[in-house]
Amino acid sequence: MTLIKSISGIRGTIGGNPEDGLNPLAIVKFVAAYATFIKKNTKVTTNKIVVGRDARISGPMVKQVVLGALTGMGFDVVDIDLATTPTTELAVAWEEACGGIILTASHNPKQWNALKLLNERGEFLNAAEGAEVLKIAAEESFVFADVDNLGKVYVNNTYNQKHIESVLKLDLVDVEAIRAANFRVAIDCVNSVGGVVIPELLSALGVKEIFKLHCAPHGNFAHNPEPIPENLTEISDLMKHAKADVGFVVDPDVDRLAIIS
């Protein structure tokens, strides 16, 4: 088992003891430390934290622990569930929340997961802020809320669509030109949240022919999820067979993209 503590959050393999793996005890400790940091430092008046996740097998378990720890610290939580990393970052700003936690180990294999910590602007904590969270966790200097001050969980599944709509409004995006081009597009979403979002985005952009690989978001990644050349052979073959104009491959939380022509 592995647990890596850094200024950007914690990541590790699922299981093990609290110091050697990403498990419920380790998650509660670091979420409570993050919540304490937010209480001390936020300039936002709302008491909300946004939580989004990729489609890893461990995601539902990790999310439930995170929701419990945050509400136990007295925070309300906006649970946006399956969402890309950029979508979760935007949701923090749109909600005017005081922070956010993204549950993803990015391009790492399925046995990994992580907590990525955001400030009230939807940005990752800087080095000094991350170090403060680690210090609070090491000292366990956090106090949970009493029964009358527990937080609540609010489910909001609209942010993927809201993000797509915001893309369509960008000046650089010409939907009519894309539609008129009749592009044939191949995608590989590595069985994670890209499979929820990328086909919808392409359809909204006017792409009529989409050739899909691994779009079911069940978390059993069909191949190494890092979109680097040695992991692109399958979509390259699909593009040749389908005579696609372009191919897009994303990692599990859709913050890495490979474009194949």
Residue ranges of model-derived segments:
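Short, flexible coil/turn micro-motifs enriched in small/turn-prone residues
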Residues: 3-7, 47, 109, 117, ...
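Conserved hydrophobic "DFG−1" position in protein kinase catalytic cores
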Residues: 117, 259-261
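Gly/Ser/Thr-enriched, mixed-charge loops and adjacent short helices
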Residues: 13, 113-242
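N-terminal small/polar loop signature for handling phosphorylated ligands or for N-terminal nucleophile
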Residues: 36, 48-112, 200-259
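Residue-level marker for buried hydrophobic side chains located in beta-strands
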Residues: 5, 185, 246-250
